[in-house]
Amino acid sequence: MERLIIKGGNHLSGEIDCSGAKNAGLPILASTILLDDSAFIGNLPHLQDITTKLELLNSMGSNINFHEDGFIEINSSNIILPEARYELVKTMRASILVMGPLVAKYGKAKISQPGGCDIDTRPIDFHLAGLEQMGAKINSDSKYIYLEANKLNPIDFDFPKVSVTGTENLMMAATLIDGVTVLRNCAKEPEVVELANYLNSCGAKIEGVGESNISITGVSNLKSNRWNILLASVNSLSPGEVLELKVIRSDEQLDLKLVTKERPNTPQAL
């Protein structure tokens, strides 16, 4: 279809429901691995990547329940298989985000290498370099990356290049490390800020988020909080998430109202 012809003349008004941002939801789902109890996440978009992430968590042993109020309950306190299998990782690069939380909480992770490529040609070298500096032992073969750590240590790490998922992975891992971790040249995207805000609502101590340098003071555990995912913005949407129509009127003003669920102002212990 080359064009749309719109014949006006009627006043436009109404409400639309805006779903949460996929790129904010994916790391928050991964971060639920860090919690000691159930996480309650709302306003998740109905997209394949979100479904795949939930399938990945479920395959590792997380218990997932869908509530009538739209919230998804995820309990990852007793993961029995800290592994991201190929059939799930190959469809979504963000599956790599379970690596940091798994090593921090369970001391090990087995992550499939999409396409069977070598470790030093993968675009996750910043993740691995940071985790190795924290004390993780890393090995690999043609199919998997293996990480083990009896104890992770705080680090001062400078990303050679800005990495959104790298920032998220190391930030999540650092939340449970005793001491202060400093990450430099961090990504500043809204989804990074949203992840830090969620973790802080669960008891983490993350400062400087949204700036180049982030400081994380480790805590012994994280507790659940009800959380609605950040609204999707035009700048952060992936193709296919929304169709944007630009309407130009010369005689009247067009008002659009965005409707979403209210986010609690204070943490709610569950």
Each language-model region and where it sits:
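Structural preference for solvent-exposed beta-strand-turn elements
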Residues: 1-232
